[in-house]
């Protein structure tokens, strides 16, 4: 199976976690897009979705799935999204698609986080994939200096503005031995909106696309 076929397999496998009559939290990226396509086959059975990005909102609407503002919703049954890396403790690096802040907010509201990935995203130690940090534009240089103090090598993602109008610093050369501690430290830097470490609130279920099928992992 190609990587895209693995992504499609896990996107469709996540449908089994969708309960009729609920509002579904939907992530962003190529794997999440396959889930959105699958979700469209159930659109008559669900109330609708809450989206983590403008791109996913457009895809949901194009398929006839009602999209709710998160402020209209008290809680979400599930949130389904991909990841750039996931470790054995179900902690993730996310934000390669620059939607990390809205993804983290929707994940916080959801009762269950279902992470959908192909097997290449599984790692023992997070950090090989550059860690995205969303930053208020005027704080970019200051935050970069603070990230260097934490042992990283931040690189400005030029030409990219988030849906919130902010910039992204991608932090290279990290071996993240204590994900929760680093998440808290980066979030404490003035000017940081959020960091793409999903450690304090990790996934509850991971669906991993492998050559021999979809594996289900839980803690």
Swiss-Prot record:
CDD domains: RPI_A (cd01398). Its EC number is 5.3.1.6. NCBIfam families: PRK00702.1, rpiA. Catalyzes the reversible conversion of ribose-5-phosphate to ribulose 5-phosphate. Belongs to the ribose 5-phosphate isomerase family. The lineage of its organism: Bacteria, Pseudomonadati, Pseudomonadota, Gammaproteobacteria, Enterobacterales. Homodimer. InterPro entries: NagB/RpiA_transferase-like, Ribose5P_isomerase_typA_subgr, Ribose5P_isomerase_type_A. It holds the Pfam family Rib_5-P_isom_A. One of its GO terms (molecular function) is ribose-5-phosphate isomerase activity. Pathway: Carbohydrate degradation; pentose phosphate pathway; D-ribose 5-phosphate from D-ribulose 5-phosphate (non-oxidative stage): step 1/1. It comes from Edwardsiella ictaluri (strain 93-146). It catalyses: aldehydo-D-ribose 5-phosphate = D-ribulose 5-phosphate. Keywords: Isomerase. One of its GO terms (biological process) is D-ribose metabolic process. GO terms for cellular component: cytosol. HAMAP family: Rib_5P_isom_A. This is Ribose-5-phosphate isomerase A. Substrate binds at residues 28-31, 81-84, 94-97, 121. The active site is at residue 103. The keyword Isomerase applies.
């Amino acid at each position: 199976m190609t990587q895209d076929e693995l992504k499609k397999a896990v996107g469709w496998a996540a449908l089994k976690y969708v309960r009729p009559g609920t509002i579904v939290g939907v992530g962003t990226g190529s794997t999440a897009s396959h889930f959105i396509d699958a979700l469209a086959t159930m659109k008559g059975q669900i109330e609708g979705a809450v989206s983590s990005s403008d791109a996913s909102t457009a895809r949901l609407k194009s398929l006839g799935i009602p999209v709710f503002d998160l402020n209209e919703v008290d809680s979400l049954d599930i949130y389904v999204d991909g990841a750039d890396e996931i470790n054995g403790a179900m902690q993730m690096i996310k934000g390669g698609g620059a939607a990390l802040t809205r993804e983290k907010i929707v994940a916080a509201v959801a009762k269950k986080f279902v992470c959908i990935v192909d097997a290449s995203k599984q790692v023992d130690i997070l950090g090989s994939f550059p860690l995205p940090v969303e930053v208020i534009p005027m704080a970019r240089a200051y935050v970069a200096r603070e990230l260097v103090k934490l042992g990283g090598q931040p690189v400005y993602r030029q030409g990219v503005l988030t849906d919130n109008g902010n910039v992204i610093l991608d932090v290279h050369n990290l071996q993240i031995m204590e994900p929760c501690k680093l998440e808290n430290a980066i979030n404490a830097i003035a000017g940081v909106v959020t960091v793409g470490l999903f450690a304090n609130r990790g996934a509850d279920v991971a669906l991993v696309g492998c050559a021999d099928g979809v594996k289900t992992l839980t803690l």
